[in-house]
Each structure stands twice: as structure tokens, then as C-alpha cells.
């Protein structure tokens, strides 16, 4: 198309037709040529079904954790609005009419989880309190005008059952200037006359109300402008008698932030009540307890993989949502990289799948390190059968999977019992949380550790009431399981409780040890001290333990035997690779990225990411065809704290000129030198933007280097 025209100054070019990018189904990623793709679709389907179960359990868990908090909030809102509806004529009631009911919701610093909580809270308030629930964020409210504009539009969107006349009123409200007067008049004409839809539960609780309240949720209150909050609260308090507003402050830090943002003259207009959500660590403990410390889900994490997820949670974001995403990534990586993960399902289904295993899949079982160790410990005849007979191998694999299932049932029951014993000990030698105890048990035989020995010594000093309380908790744990694997253990513990109850509470008389002195004899201090020490040693060696001490020792020995029998590390179990994900490094690379290392790698060795053969170079060499920023970066690594821009530019031009093989005497090279200079300026600007250099006032033609070392 010609672009030379006297009359035209703008030329239109139709874009080239591009083929629509074909989306690849996610299950096709399991068909990797580098990996064995046998049963890839079945593996993906197993992963999908298992994740749906975990996701459903997680959603139910979060609803249960927030249920108590939401119930308290609903009670507060209903009570506050009911008191507002009582038109008392006394002076105190008139003063309270200017106080806006406010709920300060302390959610913690895990801001990424707040959206889920606010969505659930909004739905709960819609169903139980009022249809007028609005959530605002600080980015949408830079001033009072935008604050009221956003509030008005959200309130209008909340009304879903209105006639055409009311819609005209809404359009008129949108066209008018946004103010609290117009909003109050709209509310009086629409909300009170329309009678919005209510559920039967809400109608029963709110039948005495003349009009439903307006609940305004301010997400992350710390982000709002102080002036905007102050002005809005003052204006709203003056219209509270005609616009029943209730505020909910979402606070991530501390309730003190309310008094820091609002002066006393403004905070006195609020009737504040605090509500505390469950702490992040307690939430994590519950999630681990329901998802990993249970035989309900066959998928498990190794010690290192679990530590990666918990460390990211504890030292980075405190986000339960990110922890669950990490768990999902672990599940996906396990089914993607482990061909035998097809057996990571319910026991009955796994047995059916083993029956149809091919020869290749049977060979994969034989190659498992845990199975090879198991074969080496078997008699010679059984070894030959396991290595040559496919039918016998399938039967033995089914038996081993069943043993692994029983192992997990007993493992988690005994783990909880041990946690009941050790969670209240001084200084918590085995950890305060069950996840700490679980990580220790995953790593090694816990009874070989010094912490375990110190815990047993402390347990041998427990009082009768403390010991009986712990044993009762253990009985509840063992009876909570539908399996009958440890039923004898529960009966044994009940027997210990019966023996404790039958003990005589009175102190037992101690037998007199040693002969009584015949008479008082004069002696010096040395011989007196020697005699007292001998008598003390004699009492210690000849003293008999009481019945309680003997029974307590029996209980501790019984628990010790349980731990040694059932808390064996999972790495010693045959076929543990089928259900345990242990690629902690892969998980760390995906979730705990190091941007500075990645940036250094990209600039220092562009071939690592671009995969261009021309970018390959020896260590310490600068490829002449590398991107400009890579050349400038590698040159700046050779400089000291201050970099001369002239020398840097000449070195850059030398490298680029070597790449393009230009003749320095030609006019083209002179023109190209300007282009090279512009390229250098752009590369330096990009390095400054990335934070590698900065201008300095020491020398005008120098820049200061900001980074040192390899990255």
C-alpha cells in the first residue's frame, strides 16, 4: 500500500490475519516424550479427582473456622440495628443515634487471604442481615467524592427487585452530584418502600425492623486516606437517623490503627467492638491436621517438601491460600513425575489397577528403591518369584499397599497420642505444634533423639491428675478412628485409667530405714555432715517406689513401646514412593523464587533462557551477539565502585563492532557509531532501572555500582 500522498496524513493498514492459538488440554502435558506416558490420562484423572476431594475438604474447613466469627458479627449487627430502631426519647438514646455501629475485624497480616474471608462474610450478611452490603477498597476512594460515588453505585447494584420507576430514580441519582443528602433521600424512597427480598431466616430475625441497615465493609483500613475516613465518618454520623449505616473495618495489623488514623473527635462518633479471627498458625495447624495427618487422602509430603511449604508460610506471607496452592503444585508434580502415582488412590481402586498392570509397569515397581530393599530382605525363593513371576508380584504389591494403608492409620493415631503427652511439657522438647513433631518423625527414628529422651524424663514427673487427663485424650483419639487396628491399645489405656482411679489417695507409709540413734552424742560439723549424707544415700537406695510411681512408669514404657512400633519413618516402608512427594528442590524453585539470581543468570548467560546457539560462550567471555543489556552488564562486572561512562561506552562499542565487523573508515561506520551510542545509553538506562547502577555527584561522567559479588 502506498504511503505517499499530498492530501492524506494518516494511513490505515489492516492487520495480518493470525491463526488463533490453539489451547492445549492440560492432560496432554502428561504425555511428555522425556517421561513414560503410559497411563498418563488415568494419572491425570486420578490427580483431578483427588484434588477435587482436597479442595472440597478445604472449603468446608474454612467455612467451619469462620463460622463462629461470622455468627458473632451477625449478632452484633442485628443487635446494633435493633437498638437503633427503638425510638427512645431520652438524652442517652439521642446521643447514641450519632454513634455509628462499627465492627473492627482483626484478620492478621495474611492480606492475600482476606478476599476469601470478605466474600464469605458478604454472602453471610446478605443471607442473614441485609441485602445492602458494600465492600470498598482504598484504591477506589482517593477522596470523599469518589468514596460516595463508589458507595452509591454499589448500593444501587445491590437492589435487584425494583420497578421501572425506581430504576428512573437510580438513573437520576447517578446523574446528580454525589452527596450523603441525595443518598439518604434515595434510601428513604427506595429501601423503605420497596421491601427488598429476604430469606425466611432473615425475615424472622428482622421482622421488627422498619428498614434494613446498610453495611459498609472497608477492606484493609490501613490503606485508606486519613482525611477521607474522617470526613466520611463525620458526614455519615449527621445522617445516621435517616441512613442507618454500619461499618466493618478490615484490619491487618492492630486495633490501635483506628486511633492513629482517627482523632478522638472522630473516633468518638463510632461505637466500636473488636472481633478477632483465628490466627494464621492455628489455621495452618487445622489445615495440616485435616489434609495431611489423616489416612483419608492417600497423598503425603516428605519431610523436606513439607518444610518448604511451612517455611514459605511462616517466613514470607502467612497465607493459607498460598499454602494450599503449594500443596496443589506438589500433587500435580507428583502425578506428573512419578509413573506409579496411578496407585495413589483409594486402596480398593489401587488393587484393581494393579491387576491390569502391564509388564513395563511391573518392571517399574521392581525398580523402586524401597521395593528393592524389601526384596533383598526376603528368602531366596521369594526373591526369585518377585523378580520373575508377574502374578506373584501383583499379589505381593497389593499386600504391600494394604500394609502401607494400615501403617498410616496406626501412624497418625500414635502420633496424636504422643503429641498429647508432649505438647504441654516445659520448653516443648518435641515441639508445641503437631506439625513440628510430625516433621521430626518423618526425618528419623524419633526415639534416637535427645529431645525424646528429655521428654520421657519430664513425663516421669507428671502428677496423677495430669497423667489421667492425657490418657483420657488418648482414648478419645483412638476411639475416633473407624478402623479397629489399635482397639487393644485403647482397652489397655482404659485399664491404666481404672488402676489410677483405684489408687488410694492417702500417702503410703514409708518403711523406716536405718537404726534409730540410741542417744544424743556430741560431734563436730564434719562428722555431722558425713552422717547426714550417708543417711540420705541409704534412704535413696533402700526406698521403694510407690504404687503410683510404678503405674506411671508402666504407662510411660507402654507409650514408648507404641512409638517404637508405629512411628517408624515412612522411607523405610515398601512402595512409599507411590504416595510420598519428595522433590523439595522442584517445589522450592517454583514457589520460593530468587529474582536476583534469576536476573543475574539472564544477564550473565542469556543462553540459559533464550536457548540460542549463537549465545554460547566460554566462561568469562562476552558473546558479541548478545543483547545490549547483557554486554553492558558483563562489562560493568569488571569495574570497581565507580564506572567511567566514556571507558564503558568505548568497551561496549568495541564488542558490538566486533560482532558487526564494520569498517572504521567508512561513512556508514560513523553513522552506526551514533546508533551504537544510543544503544549503549538505552542499556545503561535499563541497568539503572534494574538497580545495578546509579548516578553519582562525585564525578559527572561516572556512575556508581550498587551490586557486588557473583549476583
Curated annotation (Swiss-Prot):
Belongs to the ORC3 family. The modification Phosphoserine is found at residues 23, 515. One of its GO terms (molecular function) is DNA replication origin binding. Component of ORC, a complex composed of at least 6 subunits: ORC1, ORC2, ORC3, ORC4, ORC5 and ORC6. ORC is regulated in a cell-cycle dependent manner. It is sequentially assembled at the exit from anaphase of mitosis and disassembled as cells enter S phase. Signal peptide: none annotated. The gene is Orc3. This is Origin recognition complex subunit 3. Component of the origin recognition complex (ORC) that binds origins of replication. DNA-binding is ATP-dependent. The specific DNA sequences that define origins of replication have not been identified yet. ORC is required to assemble the pre-replication complex necessary to initiate DNA replication. Binds histone H3 and H4 trimethylation marks H3K9me3, H3K27me3 and H4K20me3. One of its GO terms (biological process) is regulation of DNA replication.
